Structures are given as C-alpha cells and as structure tokens.
Amino acid sequence: MAHILLVEDSPEVSMTVREILASVGHTVAEAPQGREALKLLAAGKFDLIVTDIWMPGMDGIALLKEIRGSGNSIPVVVISGGAPNAPLTYTAPLAATFGADKVIYKPFEKDELLRAITDVLSD
C-alpha cells in the first residue's frame, strides 16, 4: 500500500481522511499546512500527497507551486470545499494549473476519495 502525506488544517477532516486511508492499508503522515508538509516531504519518501487547498499559512496552491517548481512529480490529490467567496468551479482549474492530478470536493464519500487515490497511483 501507499505511504501518503496528508496536508489538512481541519482536525475533523484530517481524522476522517486518515481513517479512510488506514482502513485500506495506507500509511499516513500529517501536516496542518504547506510549510510543515514541505519539511516532511524533504525528510521522507511518499507515494502521494493529499492536500486541502484553502489553509492558513502556506496554502495548497503555494504548496503545489513549490513541489512542481522543484521538479517533483509526486502525485497530488486536492480535496477542497472551494475558494472563500468563489464558486467551486474555480478550484479545479486553479489546482490543475499548478499541477494537481485530481480534485475532489468536500463533503466527499469514502469511495470517491479512494477512487481518486487509486486513479493517480495507477497512472
């Protein structure tokens, strides 16, 4: 199974995602925002990143820019409730522009998250 870096500022969402991923055998390391995620990414080997977009501190877009700017091609699944004061349709193109492999929206179903992860890991 995969070793996944989860970047999410909401403890509730983080716990939900962690439990879903662990239920199918994935291991999960967690960071509450982008700066901490970059430190974990530099210190360890991950198969995939699952990140929120809109977080305090370094958000998911800035994280994607840093990751892709460094030449790292690790798969990234974005989970987002949408941009503050922007329609949900704004998030997917923005995330894709900066290198996200897949975008899913909160609230999401367990199967939707697992399908997105399976899709990007099999590419």
Residue ranges of each PLM-predicted region?
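Active-site beta3 strand of CheY-like receiver
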Residues: G44-V50
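Two-component/phosphorelay signaling modules centered on CheY-like receiver
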Residues: P11-A29
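Receiver (REC) domain active-site loop signature in two-component systems and cognate sites
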Residues: M55
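Helix N-cap/capping motif at the beta->alpha junctions
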Residues: E30-K39, G60
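Short amphipathic alpha-helix used as the core "switch/output" element in two-component signaling
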Residues: I61-S73
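Conserved acidic carboxylate
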Residues: E8
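Alpha4 helix (beta4-alpha4-beta5 surface) of REC/receiver domains from two-component response regulators
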Residues: A62, A83-I104, R115
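Active-site residues of response regulator receiver
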Residues: D52, S80
